[in-house]
């Protein structure tokens, strides 16, 4: 016989535990703790992979899709940008381009492809900046991870995105943060990012190569 609301049909659920706000909060905190541990583990594995010159597919697995697309775009810019276009670049972009052209001109490549990837991770010195400082604790907020300096942990210098099941480095957003202090030099001297890029290039390579000058602002016949 059919009953009213709350009849025997529904009574089976009456004794089932209801997930309280406290339980949901505890579950959320546990998930966040797991994600934080995964972020810390991912970063250590990334550093180890870079140190050991892992294959390109391994390295790209640590980067966001937007970072991979940006690397392809930047490599194309290294092949076609002239001096006028170079003046539109941020320092880290301009430095990657002139360094890429130096490697091309002096036949320094030891990889057949994904050259901009290897250039930025191994030869640019950008990640060395991070290795030389004391890092603060990693932090996460929903699907965004970050880490700052120990002296100012709330100011990030590296950013990460949660990609369904794992963390990935957002290289596009990280490089401007890493090089922010260097870019301050350009502002003080009223230099463009491209001019500062040449200054940095000369500091690193002036004892090894000649013509570290504006000739690198032009395509060199790729």
Segment roles from a protein language model:
Residues 6-55, 61, 65-72, 211-220:
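Short, low-complexity N-terminal intrinsically disordered segments enriched in polar/charged residues
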Residues 130-164, 168-222:
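Low-complexity, intrinsically disordered terminal/linker segments enriched in charged
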Residues 46, 50-53, 66, 81, ...:
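Short, flexible helical or helix-coil boundary motifs
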Residues 2-3:
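C-terminal motif of bacterial Sec signal peptides marking the signal peptidase cleavage site
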Residues 34-35, 73-88, 178-198:
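Charged, low-complexity, helix-prone segments enriched in Lys/Glu/Asp/Gln
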């Amino acid at each position: 016989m059919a009953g009213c609301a709350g009849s025997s049909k529904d009574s089976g659920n009456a004794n089932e535990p209801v997930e309280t706000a406290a339980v949901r909060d505890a579950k959320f905190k546990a998930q966040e703790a797991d994600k934080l541990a995964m972020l810390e583990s991912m970063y250590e594995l990334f550093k180890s992979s870079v140190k050991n010159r892992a294959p390109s597919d391994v390295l790209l697995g640590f980067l966001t899709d937007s970072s991979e697309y940006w690397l392809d775009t930047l490599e194309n810019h290294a092949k076609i940008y002239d001096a006028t276009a170079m003046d539109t670049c941020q320092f880290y972009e301009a430095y990657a381009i002139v360094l890429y052209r130096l490697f091309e001109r002096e036949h320094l490549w030891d990889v057949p492809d994904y050259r901009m990837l290897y250039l930025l991770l191994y030869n640019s010195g950008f990640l060395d900046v991070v290795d030389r400082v004391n890092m603060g604790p990693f932090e996460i907020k929903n699907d965004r991870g970050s880490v700052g300096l120990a002296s100012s942990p709330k100011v990030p210098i590296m950013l990460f995105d949660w990609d369904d099941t794992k963390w990935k480095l957002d290289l596009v957003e990280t490089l401007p943060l890493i090089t922010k202090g260097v870019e301050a030099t350009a502002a003080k001297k009223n230099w463009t990012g491209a001019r500062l890029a040449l200054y940095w290039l000369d500091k690193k390579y002036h004892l090894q190569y000649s013509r570290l000058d504006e000739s690198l602002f032009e395509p060199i016949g790729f």
